[in-house]
Amino acid sequence: MPDKLIEIMAHKRREIAPLIRPVTETELAQLDASRPKPPSFADALRRPDGTLAVISEIKRRSPSAGEIKAGASAVEQARRYRAAGADALSILTDTEFFGGTLADLSDVTTEFRDQRPAPPCLRKDFMVHPVQVAQAREAGASAILIIVRALDDAEIQALYSAAQAAGLDALFEVHHETELERALHHRARIIGVNNRDLAVFKTDLALSERLIPQFPRDVIAVSESGIFTGADARRVHAVGAHAVLVGEALMKAPDPAALIAEFRAR
């Protein structure tokens, strides 16, 4: 079976090629200073009561699930999630494979701009260049995604340095011990285990059960993909996950609040 992540990354590199330009840390720091400070993504993932934080994802479709909620309004979905008690939002901005747009992110952060506390928003995309970090900050994101397997170490460092200069957190995504080692080499503060193998898009919660216990205690642990029930959430919480990132199950849920409560139940 062809490696889907290779296909996606090749498309993403072609897509952003016309936008690539030098982006300095000074420029990003000035951008950060000129914009309202976004809420902290990292802080939202450690709940004071010790229950799982829930990152609720806005995702219209995916290569694994196909159409999930075609034509869904990002703002309306974000309102539903916020009312349901989501701790943070993940907003797909990839159009080709996931049906999202950068405007979705901007629209959602604008919607909550005057609320206190506003939900922190992750720009969920296939990041390859600091210009995408600048876009994320301009759109009001609190964090970006860094997929370790998809990038070389120089690209990871460039993205992470850009995120820090722009005042953004970074969620490092890993799927294997070697990727975890690389994330830790870059001093990642937030690491997510993607239970879905992005090569073939199959999920296995045993990945979180294997990798999260290897995280240093000061790293925020996130379990991503394959979380559909309270039992799933309890499995990953039991091995040290601070948060779960859930898309498909919440997009389809008739009552997101009930499902989020189920995820948090001990």
From Swiss-Prot:
UniProt pathway: Amino-acid biosynthesis; L-tryptophan biosynthesis; L-tryptophan from chorismate: step 4/5
Keywords from the named record: Amino-acid biosynthesis, Aromatic amino acid biosynthesis, Decarboxylase, Lyase, Tryptophan biosynthesis
Catalytic class of the enzyme: lyase
InterPro entries: Aldolase_TIM (IPR013785), Indole-3-glycerol_P_synth (IPR045186), Indole-3-glycerol_P_synth_dom (IPR013798), Indole-3-GlycerolPSynthase_CS (IPR001468), RibuloseP-bd_barrel (IPR011060)
The keyword Lipid metabolism appears for this protein: no
UniProt catalytic activity: 1-(2-carboxyphenylamino)-1-deoxy-D-ribulose 5-phosphate + H(+) = (1S,2R)-1-C-(indol-3-yl)glycerol 3-phosphate + CO2 + H2O
Superkingdom of the source species: Bacteria
EC numbers, comma separated: 4.1.1.48
Any one Gene Ontology BP term: L-tryptophan biosynthetic process
Matches recorded under Pfam families: IGPS
GO molecular function: indole-3-glycerol-phosphate synthase activity; phosphoribosylanthranilate isomerase activity
UniProt xrefs under PANTHER family: INDOLE-3-GLYCEROL-PHOSPHATE SYNTHASE (PTHR22854:SF2), TRYPTOPHAN BIOSYNTHESIS PROTEIN (PTHR22854)
Record HAMAP family: IGPS_B
Family: Belongs to the TrpC family.
NCBIfam families: PRK00278.2-4 (NF001377)
Name of this protein: Indole-3-glycerol phosphate synthase
Originating species: Opitutus terrae (strain DSM 11246 / JCM 15787 / PB90-1)
Gene: trpC
